[in-house]
Amino acid sequence: MKNYVKPGTLEEAYELNQKRANRIIGGMMWIRMGRGNVNTVIDLSGLGLDQITETETEFHIGCMSTLHQLETHSGLKETFGDFFKECTRHIVGVQFRNGATVGGSIFGRYGFSDILTAFLVLDTKVKLYKKGIVPLSEFIRMDRDRDILEELIVAKDGRKAVYLSERRSQTDFPVLTCAASEKDGTVLLSIGARPMKADVTETTLDEMEQAADTFTYGSNMRGSGEYRKHLGRVLAGRAKKALEEGNV
C-alpha cells in the first residue's frame, strides 16, 4: 500500500476506484490477506455510510455498518428475531465483528460468507453508486466491476427467517451455511460455503429438503461434495422444522 485517501464524496471515491491498482477498503479484515499490490486504498468511513436506519417499510444498512451492528440492532431483532445474531455470532469474535463491514461482506461475494447467505433469503436490494438499486439475487450474478455499494435495503414484509450453519469449531469457517425464509407459503432457501458463494432458490415448506439437492456442492479441506450435499438436506430439514414451529 502506497497511498491512503479518505474522500469527501462518493463521486471522488468512485473516480479513484476506477484505477485497477486502487482498492476500496471496508474493515480490512480480508483485504490484508491478499497478495496483490495496492497503490491507493480508499476509505469510505467519512461519508456517513456506517448507519442502520429504519422506516415503516424497510431497513437501510450502510455499507460501512459493522457485523456487530447487525448482531445488536434492536429494530432488526424486533423484525427478524435472532436471525442476524445467528448469522454473525460464529464469525471469529466481537472484536473482529466490530471491524468487518456489511458492504465488504456482500460486495466481496465470498464463498464462505454467512452474511451473503442470510441476506439472500430476505427481500434485499443493493444500492450501487452508478447502477442504482438492484435485487441482491441479481447482484451476485453480475460481473465484478468498479462500482461502489452504498447500502443494502431490506424490506419489512413480515417474512419469518431462520439461519443455520455447520462448523468444525465455533468460530471456524463454515463447512456449509443455510438460511430460509417463509412468507405466504413461499420459501426462499439459500445455501453457501458449498464451497462457493451462496445462491438462492424458491420452494415450499414441503419441498425444502428436495430443493437443497438442486444446489451444486464441491469439495475442499473441510469436506467433500457428497458430505456437503448430505448436510444441505439436514440443514434444510432443520430450517423447515423451525419455520413450521415458529422457532425463529
Functional labels for PLM-detected ranges:
Residues 1-248:
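C-terminal structural segment of proteins
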